[in-house]
Every structure is written in structure tokens, then in C-alpha cells.
From Swiss-Prot:
GO BP annotation list: translation
Superkingdom of this protein's organism: Bacteria
SUPFAM superfamilies per record: Ribosomal protein S8 (SSF56047)
Keyword Nucleotide-binding: no
Protein name (Swiss-Prot/TrEMBL): Small ribosomal subunit protein uS8
UniProt cross-references to InterPro entries, sorted A to Z: Ribosomal_uS8, Ribosomal_uS8_CS, Ribosomal_uS8_sf
One cellular component (GO) term of this entry: ribonucleoprotein complex
Record note on quaternary structure: Part of the 30S ribosomal subunit. Contacts proteins S5 and S12.
Family: Belongs to the universal ribosomal protein uS8 family.
Gene Ontology MF term list: rRNA binding; structural constituent of ribosome
NCBIfam families documented for this protein: PRK00136.1
Keyword RNA-binding found: yes
The encoding gene: rpsH
Length: 133
């Protein structure tokens, strides 16, 4: 079944896999999900991701990151901000800080998908996709 919100689907799959302490999770591969996975990897929230499958049925296998003996998830929470029914945009001066800089906001800008920190540094605003902490 086709999903209307691939970003929300990706965040939910990561959240559910984290709660169940799964080592990996699989999400449909799109340009947007690849970019978000790359940002999560660069920020240290996930170990790695790779594409599997062929042709139309491409998936991303995301390797989740845990810490300590109790395997506490590195990602405490994921929150979808801009949704298909209500888009949320922010200019460069109003980019949100997540938990005073502890978390990140993932922003879709004209320069690509990046964190709020990178967008502030580049002086661009855009659509606030989600918060991760």
C-alpha cells in the first residue's frame, strides 16, 4: 500500500524499532528518506544505512545505535513537525532550537536537507520536517 507521508512512516518505523530494541529497521527508499538518514548518520543518531532491493522495490536498511549494557537507544524521541495537512516553514532568523541545542531539527531547504545548525550557518530557512533528540 502506498503511503502519503513517507517521512512520517520513516520516523514511526525508527521509533518502533528503537522501542523494541531491534538492531535494524527497513524503510522505503526515496530521495527524501536517504537524505534524512544521511543527516541522522552524520549527527550520530544511527550507525549506518544501506540500500537493498532492485528497481522499484528499493529499501533502506537503517542500523540503529544503542548505548550501554541496557542498550538504551541513542534516539530518545522523534517528532514530525511539518505534515502533509499542515506545512511548517521557518525563515533563517526563526529556525527552532531543539532542547536548547541538545537535539536537532531537520530542515528541507533550497540547498538540500540539513540540520537547523547547518541552515543557520548557511543563512537559509525552509520547511521544518522533524525534531530528533
Amino acid at each position: 500500500m502506498a503511503t502519503s507521508d513517507t517521512i512520517g512512516d520513516m520516523l514511526t518505523r525508527i521509533r518502533n524499532a528503537n522501542l523494541a530494541r531491534h538492531p535494524t529497521t527497513e524503510v522505503p527508499a526515496t530521495r527524501m528518506t536517504r537524505s534524512i538518514a544521511q543527516v541522522l548518520k552524520n549527527e550520530g543518531f544511527i550507525n549506518d544505512f544501506e540500500e537493498i532491493g532492485d528497481g522499484v522495490k528499493l529499501n533502506l536498511v537503517i542500523s540503529l545505535k544503542y548505548r550501554g549494557k541496557q542498550r538504551q537507544p541513542t534516539i530518545t524521541a522523534l517528532k514530525r513537525i511539518s505534515k502533509p495537512g499542515l506545512r511548517v516553514y521557518s525563515n533563517r532568523r526563526e529556525l527552532p532550537r531543539v532542547l536548547g541545542g541538545i537535539g536537532i531539527a531537520i530542515i528541507s531547504t533550497s540547498s538540500g536537507i540539513m540540520t537547523d545548525r547547518d541552515a543557520r550557518r548557511s543563512g537559509v530557512g525552509g520547511e521544518v520536517l522533524c525534531y530528533v533528540w
